[in-house]
């Protein structure tokens, strides 16, 4: 964005009516920021705050052929190869943040006194928050580990990648939401990390592909298996 020295631009390098799949007509090209014709219009605020994201206009920009990344037509596949590992990384990062939110929530439940000096930990609502958050974190963690192991083994991880891409941000959102509720007004203040966590969890449901697209991919992969006369093996 605003701080970058160069951009990786994925653009169409073949006509749409040319033979072949549309995805095979995309190529990645390195464009230095100071190249003539590269115009940064503005920084784009995210969640009401300044960010490194920006709007860029490319006006008759020309770069040497050597700036092409990989072979012509391989840009889309290169991006997809990166996204798989990137989605696992984002899920792992989210689980770490969920863990931190959980620690802060339990700390508050154990120390906060309410009417008559009774601790929040004796309230069944709060006990439910702890149990639900534990299950959210543990299920997200195990799903992500399973997906990473499948990627490392060379098996097809696409359904699992889409599954964690959908599930983990939702679990993250639920855990942080409970932590905010336990902390009350302090939970939405800048003294605690929940506001940025909350925004991050919600953003992840859009970044690298929205929930709806990944749910469609999951369903199509499952249906394809059953149409072939097979069942889904949840053990692998």
Task: Name each model-derived stretch.
Residues 35-37, 47-49, 72-76, 194-198:
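Short, surface-exposed loop/turn microsegments at beta-strand edges and helix-strand junctions
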Residues 1-40:
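A short core secondary-structure module
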Residues 25, 52, 162:
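Exposed loop/turn and edge beta-strand positions of beta-sandwich/beta-sheet ligand-binding modules
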Residues 1, 21-23, 45-50, 83-93:
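Short alpha-helix boundary/capping segments
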Residues 55-60, 65, 74, 80-236:
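Alpha-helical interface subdomain recognition
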Residues 31-62:
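Flexible, small-/acidic-enriched active-site or ligand-binding loops
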Residues 19-23, 40-42, 65-72, 230:
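Short, charged, solvent-exposed linker or helix-capping segments at domain edges/interfaces
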